[in-house]
Amino acid sequence: MSPVFNVNVGVGQSSALSPILFALYLLPLIYILEKYLKNLEISILIISFVDNGLFISQSKSFDISNSRLFCSYNIFSNLLKKFSLVVEYFKTEIFHFNRSRGTFNPPPLNLSSLESNILRPNNIWKYLGFIFDKKLTFH
């Protein structure tokens, strides 16, 4: 390993090289996270497209789903800290899908104990140009 030294140049966000460097740097962290979650038997699917990452939990119980998301977020934010990276809390969102016909009022995900905020579920979710609603009606 080389010694640590200061660098006064970088790659801009609009550069074609940015997503490649981001993926090369972040992919080992995602791999480590997946191994941690598997060992802890926490069922979470991780999807990443450039710098947009998703933790997906499927459960009929909000408590179970939120618990899985909380643990995943905690482990991932700690991994990021070890690599001198941080989660942009203001960009963190939670969204629940439910196709039942009854009242749908999902609980928030409280991340305040992890130096983050309380995530209140959104009514719509925009991801990579697609707009989703809670019932997946795509109107």
Describe the function of each predicted region.
Residues M1-V4:
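Reverse-transcriptase-like RNA-dependent polymerase core
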